[in-house]
Each structure stands twice: as C-alpha cells, then as structure tokens.
Amino acid sequence: MATIEESLALIGRGAEEILKLDQLQARLATGKPLRVKAGFDPTAPDLHLGHTVLLNKMRQFQQLGHQVIFLIGDFTGMIGDPSGKNATRKPLSREDVLANARTYEEQVFKILDRERTEVRFNSEWFGQMSAADMIKLSAQHTVARMLERDDFAKRFGSQQPIAIHEFLYPLVQGYDSVALKADVELGGTDQKFNLLMGRGLQEHYGQAPQIVLTMPLLEGLDGVAKMSKSLGNYIGINEPAIDIVTKTMKIGDELTWRWIDLLSFDISLAEAARLKEQVAAGELHPREVKLRLARELATRFHDAATAEQAIAGWHAVVTGQGDTSLLPLQEVVVPDEGLRLAGLLTAAGLTPSNSEATRKLKERAVRIDGEVVEDPSRVFTHGFEGVIQVGKRNFARVLLVTA
C-alpha cells in the first residue's frame, strides 16, 4: 500500500493545481477509498489523447485503491458547456448525446479498470428534478458571481450574448458532485470555476467540500493549440495503431516531454528526468524517447503485437527499408486531368500550401517511394499509389481517386 507521500506524488504528477492540498492529505490519512469524479459531456463520438489526460489521472487514483466515477453528462451535454467559448454553443439533441455516450463507454475501459469504475449519467438526478427544484438550485448563486468567470466577463464586456441556460451550466455541473457525494473532482484548467462551484454547493447541502484537481490542457500535434478535432491536431484513441505511431513520431522534441508527463504510465518522472539528461548530453537521440512513447500509446489502445507492426511500418518509411504496405492508405481525390505534384503534397496534408510544397521540392526534401523528386509541375492521375515523404517526419501512403 502506498504511503501518503507516495500517493501525493502520483496524484500530483502533471497536475496544475490541487485545492486544497491539506484537505486531500487529511482524507488520504483516513485510509478510506475516495470517490473521484470526472465528467465528460458526450459532444462528439470519439475520444482523443486530450481527453485521456483526465482518464489517466483517474487510472492513477485507481492504482492507489480509490473508486472513480466516470460521469457522462447526457443532461449537461444538451445544455452545452460554455467554458472557454466566445459564443453560445449549439445544444445537442438527445439522440446525438446518447449515441455519443455509448461510444464513450466502449472507449474509456481501454484505460480505466472496470472493477473500480462507476459509470453514471447525470440525467439520473436531473431527469427527476422539478422546475421548482431547478429554481432553488439557481438561487444558490448570483449573476455577479457568474460574471466573475473570465469567458462570461469577456462576452459581457464585448456585448456578446450570454444565454440564461449557459449560466445554469456551472450550477448543474456543481450539483453533480452533490448527487455523487464526490471527494475529489478532476477537470481541465478551463473548468476551475465549475469545479469550485461544486465545492460551494456541497457545503450548502451539508457535505464535505470536494478537493479540486485541475489538469493542463494537452497541446496538440502542432505543439501550440489545445488538442482538438476541429483543429485537426489530434490523435483519436480509436485510430489505427499505425496512425498513433506515425502522428506521435511527428511531434516536436520539446512536446515529447510534455506528453510523457501527462500521458505515460510506463515512464516515471525520475526516469523522464534521466532520459532528458541523456538527450541533452548527446547520449540518446530524442527519436528513441519519442518511439518509446509511441509504442506505449499504440499498445494501450491496441496491443503489443499491433504496436510493433505499426512501428515496423513507420521504420520502413524512415529508413527506406522494409514493408511500406503496413502504412495506412490515404485516398486523395483528384480531378480527371490529374494533379500537379505541388498540389498533391498540399491535398495530402503534407504541406500547408502549394508555395510551401514548391519550396520543399526545390530543397530536394520530397521523396516518392524513396526517390527524390523536384518537378512541381509533374502530373499525377487517379490510380497512382505510393509513399510520399516531405522532410524527415511527414509522410503518407496515398492512393489517387476521382470524385
């Protein structure tokens, strides 16, 4: 059994803030398993690595013997979380929410231990709540308090509309903690206001206030913006292993350490520090560290054999040796007259623009099936299939098709 110090070290790994740490220490000292809650609104059908930051922390609590509650916000999903939004979010239909919720249940157990997980839906209590009960809940906070939230304050200051139902969202999320008698609630840094709302409501209803633990928002593949499906800088946990490997191997060297901190179970903080020292001293290539992370992620969401096959496919492209047919085939739609090479590189997502594609060609940084190509006007027509590589990290196995 872990000591309190060991528990705090694991719980604190990667965490942005713990409120309040002394209360967490006191509850750990009782030896009683904590009820650890994290809520997910099923606004999209698939989870990506950004979502798993919270799931990983839940798994760490499970490793310490605690019970986690994976709360599916089927009720709140129909409201739409306004956190970080500069405009009112379009609510989802009941059918969309339930369909997405089913896929969430299938995906989370790639990380969480079923035996120590409660899956709950907040429609369990909100579906029974009367209009009078909702009004009583709304009376617990003022409009002035809601406007303390940064996103609401900005929208109010710029005269952007804020719908009444958006003010309800923090209260509704906070009441989830009352209904579940949560000891700890996890959330992203953008959720802090809502999580603190839960503490206040628990006290109002005579419960001990939950400990709030916030986790950073994971940067996506570009290393800049928050991982998001809409930005295209994400890795979905249901993606093929080869995609998980190839995308992970494309991230910047500095971002690798951030991902290890927030996503890895196998690499401890102490080992990560040693690896970083070895890389800095030139004793270890950063690619080897990245490859270890890619293998861990592909194994977690698939299995060891599939992960090794994916790594073999990636290695075949990088070295020019091996079986490139292991790479996923990406279909690129081309007009009947075909597509020039510069346009093909852009259409395949290997360069952001035709001008950048032309520049890469002039630098002799483009290969097709291992051979350097330079002519931007070379035309490719439907039926062409090959592995195109731009620089060291960007490559794709493409098949040209007509619309």
From Swiss-Prot:
Name of the encoding gene: tyrS
Q: Name one GO biological process term.
A: tyrosyl-tRNA aminoacylation
Q: Which residues bind ATP?
A: K229
Which GO CC terms are listed, alphabetically? Answer: cytosol
Q: Which UniProt keywords apply?
A: Aminoacyl-tRNA synthetase, ATP-binding, Cytoplasm, Ligase, Nucleotide-binding, Protein biosynthesis, RNA-binding
The cross-references to NCBIfam families, in alphabetical order and at most eight, read: tyrS
List the catalysed reactions. Answer: tRNA(Tyr) + L-tyrosine + ATP = L-tyrosyl-tRNA(Tyr) + AMP + diphosphate + H(+)
This entry's Enzyme Commission designation comes to 6.1.1.1
Ranges of residues in domain S4 RNA-binding: 339-400
Q: Which Pfam families match?
A: tRNA-synt_1b (PF00579)
Where in or outside the cell it occurs: the entry states: Cytoplasm
Report the protein name in the record.
Tyrosine--tRNA ligase
The record describes the protein's role as: Catalyzes the attachment of tyrosine to tRNA(Tyr) in a two-step reaction: tyrosine is first activated by ATP to form Tyr-AMP and then transferred to the acceptor end of tRNA(Tyr).
Q: What family does the database annotate?
A: Belongs to the class-I aminoacyl-tRNA synthetase family. TyrS type 2 subfamily.
Q: Where is this motif: 'KMSKS' region?
A: 226-230
